[in-house]
UniProtKB/Swiss-Prot annotation:
GO biological process, alphabetically ordered: translation
GO CC, one annotated term: ribonucleoprotein complex
Keywords on record: Ribonucleoprotein, Ribosomal protein
Protein name as annotated: Large ribosomal subunit protein bL36
The organism's place on the tree of life at top rank: Bacteria
Keyword Ribosomal protein assigned: yes
Any Pfam family: Ribosomal_L36
Matching InterPro entries: Ribosomal_bL36 (IPR000473), Ribosomal_bL36_sp (IPR035977)
NCBIfam families membership: rpmJ_bact
Gene: rpmJ
Family: Belongs to the bacterial ribosomal protein bL36 family.
Length: 37
């Protein structure tokens, strides 16, 4: 899980979702998981 000021899609499988006011990226590739913080 990477914590970044700006989250971006890293590949076509990445999905940007908002969970409890936190923007997250979920993906089949565990390396691509991110959240904004």
């Amino acid at each position: 899980m990477k914590v970044r000021p700006s989250v971006k899609k890293m590949c076509d499988n990445c999905k940007i979702i908002k969970r409890r006011g936190v923007i997250r990226v979920i993906c089949a590739t565990p390396k691509h998981k991110q959240r904004q913080g």
